[in-house]
Amino acid sequence: MGITFYSLGAAQEVTGSKHVLEINGVPLLVDCGAFQGTRAEADRKNREFAIPAEKLSAVVLTHAHYDHCGLLPLLVKKGFKQNIFATSATRDLANLIMMDSARIQKRDAEYLEKQAKKRGEAFNWCPLFDESDVVKTMNQFVSISYNRKLFAAPNVEIEFFDAGHILGSALTNIRVINEKSEDVNILFSGDLGRQGKPIIRNPDTTLPPPDYIVLESTYGDRLHDHADAVLDELAFIVHRCVEKKGKIIIPAFAVERTQELIYYFNILTMQRKMRCSAIQT
């Protein structure tokens, strides 16, 4: 039995998660995320699509952030016809995020075409995918509950465990069944949450012992403050801003981070540490 692993994104960088696990020469893809950054660089890297779409046995999606699911419609557009395995929450969130991306790309194309016409230049940029590609992609999803084993490909069994990152996020154990020797367990962390988050469960630690771990390390070199310390700091900032009759703008991811901030503001209001003010999202 031969197992080969390589990454096509999120290696020495943060976005564009794509990890390929080849088992006896047959590739399985873990995540198919979009690169993010400056418009030109991200567009170039997203179009340099080095995945053999028609050869993939399956896709395993760890969670629905754009840098993990954003290029699934492009994968389908390029000929991928097999199953995409994810939790039901990840499936539903990914649908919203991929549809939103398709609409943004359409608006970008319309805007850029107008700008090119004003300058008298030729325009040949097109979106990576459209809404019809997203619909086709959603038809290939197979949803799996946590702690349920399922064969994703011949001799390849997957099982999801709560990663505690966002709704539906999953640590993924891939068990490669070897009839001639011991099985091999390969654990993909996806994006891993931390304990004590207010609206997301703690990461599951009741996993089978892995032989290999593919671990994300975005915050691997830092310690996070406790939630109580964050609340006190947030209350201080809001109180100071109110005294100065100012406004607070908080850039936050639409999925999980924004909901967590609203939760914190509600807690502060209930504890009378903050006046009830207008919050717009």
Q: Model-derived features: where do they sit?
A:
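Divalent metal-coordination and catalytic microenvironments
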Residues: 5, 31, 63-64, 94, ...
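Short catalytic-loop micro-motif centered on adjacent basic/acidic residues
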Residues: 6, 60-61, 248-251
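Short helix/loop capping segments that flank catalytic or ligand/cofactor-binding pockets
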Residues: 16, 38, 69-70, 95, ...
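Catalytic core of the metallo-beta-lactamase
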Residues: 8, 14, 20-23, 144-205
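Pre-active-site segment of Zn-dependent metallo-hydrolases
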Residues: 11-13, 23-82, 86-139, 192-203, ...
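Well-ordered alpha-helical segments embedded in enzymatic catalytic cores
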Residues: 7, 71, 233-237
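Extreme N-terminal starter segment of soluble prokaryotic enzymes
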Residues: 1-4, 27
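Cap/insert and terminal regions of metallo-dependent hydrolase folds
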Residues: 83, 171, 193-280
